[in-house]
């Protein structure tokens, strides 16, 4: 068993980096500690020009760089120095004049940045595939018992601190080794993903008209948390986040207080946050079992998120119990007090949490309070995944959304201005309700949500029941459906409960029949031409 606390000093280091962030300071610290530095190409020039003593690898090996820099470090004096086992390979190393290299600081050619540039062609992409770098990284990682490998600039300071007290422990070197293999795995995966999108059936291979989906799919996620259990207590679970952070989300949120997030907390909070992101004006979304059970939008001058919370809660006070609450504005103390005084809540999430709100919620120690940061108005494109037994379904994110200008009026009566506001609001909510989804709304407040039914008509019936149970008036409300109505019965039922306007994708074989039903009832109906199934 290796002693994890024994420190090994560093006498010789090899530095060769593409990303030169912090490398000068790191090299200067190594030099002050008496470490001999070997370096290559641009890194060597940077160090030399800034007064850091370094030996160029070509001078050290006696073998000049060649093939436009393709061959620099691929030499026995380099890899023997990295891979040589101290106490086992000393004799053969001495015989061939190979000196041990105790630390390797390497990061790789910027392949991702290169292929992200407009007009990047295949030869350019290929030239930015690093060979010597990954080889050194893997060699040093394999021999981490004797060698420290550093691929992240964020580790430089910790390494220097360790060297100042006698060297790096095995535990430190093991952690650096793991980071190194994660680094090369992500790098190789990125290359395979990119090359796997090129159409091999064409006579000339080109990066033009690449497929959206690679032949094999590689992605890297980092474990953020091990959970007590999964969706159910008999299931084990962990939460992994994308290695490269994107827009504000549940994966980037900071937990300010409360119990550890559960598997279901994460899933439900994601649903709530993604829904509330859809709104520009102050909004509140309450979610239970990944379905919105109450949503409202209220302009600042009419009460903002404080009023929006009241209206969202009023939609379904029973389902809101133990729910997740999301806002698209800073959570203030008054709104926080209204929540904790009124109901049991699992999670509250907002882009920012005021100190007053933190002080209020602190009295409820179990409430999970999350701050996720601001998000851009434009939603980032990306992929969504759904696991099936033995496979993975991959699709582009459903970031499609409509405005009033996109609506196609298909009935004799056009919707009023207020109805249009409510229709667009209800449509945004319906996108986040499990199919079949029906949403009743009035004055930009949900008054009934029917979710997850096999029959669209039954979802509509549930929405009406929810509204009646909450004491909310359906008469004059609008209705949103995430997919088209296959028969007129959905409209007939809407007319019976007092729905005044309907928004739906359209596209049914019986659209004419459905439109006729709306006209008979004096209902205004608009088509979006866009479906929002959610399973």
From Swiss-Prot:
Reaction(s) catalyzed by this protein? (6R)-10-formyltetrahydrofolate + 5-amino-1-(5-phospho-beta-D-ribosyl)imidazole-4-carboxamide = 5-formamido-1-(5-phospho-D-ribosyl)imidazole-4-carboxamide + (6S)-5,6,7,8-tetrahydrofolate; IMP + H2O = 5-formamido-1-(5-phospho-D-ribosyl)imidazole-4-carboxamide
Protein's pathway: Purine metabolism; IMP biosynthesis via de novo pathway; 5-formamido-1-(5-phospho-D-ribosyl)imidazole-4-carboxamide from 5-amino-1-(5-phospho-D-ribosyl)imidazole-4-carboxamide (10-formyl THF route): step 1/1; Purine metabolism; IMP biosynthesis via de novo pathway; IMP from 5-formamido-1-(5-phospho-D-ribosyl)imidazole-4-carboxamide: step 1/1
**Does the UniProt entry include the keyword Hydrolase?**
yes
Q: Which Gene3D superfamilies does the UniProt record give?
A: 3.40.140.20, Methylglyoxal synthase-like domain
Please indicate if the UniProt record lists Glycosyltransferase as a keyword.
no
Q: Which GO molecular function annotation, any one, does this entry have?
A: phosphoribosylaminoimidazolecarboxamide formyltransferase activity
Which GO biological process entries does UniProt record here?
'de novo' IMP biosynthetic process
Supply the EC number(s): 2.1.2.3, 3.5.4.10
Mind telling me which CDD domains this protein's record contains? IMPCH
Give the protein's recorded name: Bifunctional purine biosynthesis protein PurH
State the species of origin. Answer: Pseudomonas putida (strain GB-1)
Tell me the lineage of the source organism. Answer: Bacteria, Pseudomonadati, Pseudomonadota, Gammaproteobacteria, Pseudomonadales
């Amino acid at each position: 068993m290796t002693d994890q606390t024994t420190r090994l000093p560093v006498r010789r280091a090899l530095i060769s980096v593409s990303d030169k962030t912090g490398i000068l300071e790191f090299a200067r610290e190594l030099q002050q500690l008496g470490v001999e530095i070997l370096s290559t190409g641009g890194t060597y020039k940077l160090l030399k020009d800034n007064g850091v003593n370094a030996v160029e690898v070509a001078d050290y090996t006696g073998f000049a760089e060649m093939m436009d820099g393709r061959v620099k470090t691929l030499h026995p004096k380099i890899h023997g120095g990295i891979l040589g086992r101290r106490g086992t390979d000393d004799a053969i190393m001495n015989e061939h004049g190979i000196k041990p290299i105790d630390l390797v600081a390497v990061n790789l050619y910027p392949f991702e940045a290169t292929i992200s540039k407009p007009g990047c062609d295949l030869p350019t992409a290929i030239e930015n595939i690093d060979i010597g770098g990954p080889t050194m990284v893997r060699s040093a990682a394999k021999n981490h018992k004797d060698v420290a490998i550093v691929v992240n600039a964020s580790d430089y300071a910790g390494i220097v601190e360790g060297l100042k007290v006698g060297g790096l422990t095995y535990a430190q070197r093991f952690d650096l080794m793991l980071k190194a293999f994660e680094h090369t795995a992500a790098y190789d995966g990125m290359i395979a993903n990119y090359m796997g999108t090129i159409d091999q059936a064409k006579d000339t291979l080109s990066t033009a008209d690449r497929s959206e989906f690679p032949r094999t799919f590689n992605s890297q996620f980092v474990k953020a948390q091990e959970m007590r259990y999964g969706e159910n207590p008999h299931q084990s679970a962990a939460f992994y986040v994308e290695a490269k952070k994107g827009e504000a989300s549940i994966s980037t949120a900071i937990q300010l207080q409360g119990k550890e997030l559960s598997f279901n907390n994460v899933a439900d909070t994601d649903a709530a946050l993604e829904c509330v992101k859809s709104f520009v004006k102050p909004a509140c979304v309450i979610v239970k079992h990944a379905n919105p059970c109450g949503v409202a939008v209220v302009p600042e001058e009419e009460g903002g998120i404080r009023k929006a919370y009241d209206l969202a809660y009023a939609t379904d006070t029973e389902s809101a119990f133990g729910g997740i609450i999301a806002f698209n504005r800073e959570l203030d103390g008054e709104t926080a007090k209204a929540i904790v005084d009124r109901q049991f809540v699992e999670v509250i999430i907002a882009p920012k949490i005021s100190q007053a709100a933190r002080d209020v919620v602190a009295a409820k120690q179990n409430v999970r309070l999350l701050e996720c940061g601001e998000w851009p108005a434009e939603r980032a494109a990306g992929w969504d995944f759904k696991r099936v037994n033995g496979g993975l379904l991959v699709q582009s994110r459903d970031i499609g959304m409509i405005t009033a200008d996109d609506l196609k009026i298909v009935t004799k009566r056009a919707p009023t201005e207020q109805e249009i506001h409510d229709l667009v609001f209800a449509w945004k909510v319906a996108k986040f309700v499990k199919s079949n989804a029906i949403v009743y709304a009035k004055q930009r407040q949900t008054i009934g949500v029917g979710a997850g039914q096999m029959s669209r008509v039954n979802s509509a019936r549930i929405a009406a029941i929810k509204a009646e149970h909450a004491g909310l008036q359906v008469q004059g409300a609008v209705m949103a459906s995430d997919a088209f109505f296959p028969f007129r019965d959905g409209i007939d039922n809407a007319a019976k409960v007092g729905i005044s306007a309907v928004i739906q994708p359209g596209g049914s074989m019986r659209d004419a029949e459905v439109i006729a039903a709306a006209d008979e009832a004096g209902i205004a109906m608009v088509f979006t031409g866009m479906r929002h199934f959610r399973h």
